[in-house]
Amino acid sequence: MEDVTKKSDESRLRYVILQETFTLQNKLTIPKIGLGTWQSSPEDAYNATKFAIQNGYRHVDTAAAYKNEEAVGKAVRDSGVAREEIFVTTKVPAELKTYQEAVDSIDASLKKLDLGYIDLILIHAPRPWKIMGNNPENKDFYLENIDV
């Protein structure tokens, strides 16, 4: 871990905040703050991810739908920080409906990221778009669950 005593007070505070974690019920920890890569081109995702990790971030979020997993994985590998210090989250597309589609998506993400493992895999916005989004009768349910 980096020696934060040589940093300015502001820089030290920022670094300490980036190191804060939540402890999950199974005793694993997840950094409270992470870098999101949504709407980032592969080049931007690479540069932002590498810079963020080198400046204290320890959680990076990507998704198959973002089409930047390869760049994010390369940035993690090129950051100079040990892989086990970085928490990587990715997501399988919400439209995948079968077990095998999910397995194939996870395998594809593992290959693109090329990090050996993924720390957290989520279902990307897990709501049935066609059923929920186009039916006015579901409006209240959708609004109540928009953050779920």
PLM regions: where:
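A short, structured active-site edge motif that brings together acidic residues
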Residues: 84-96, 117-126
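Feature marks short, surface-exposed loop/turn motifs that line or immediately flank catalytic pockets
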Residues: 39-42, 66, 96, 124-129
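Short active-site-adjacent helix-start/loop capping segments
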Residues: 69-70, 85, 96-98, 130-131
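Short acidic, gly/pro-rich beta-turn/loop elements at beta-sheet edges
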Residues: 45, 98-100, 133
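N-terminal binding-site loop/beta-alpha segment at the start of enzyme catalytic domains
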Residues: 1-86, 104, 116
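Glycine/proline-rich, positively charged
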Residues: 103-148
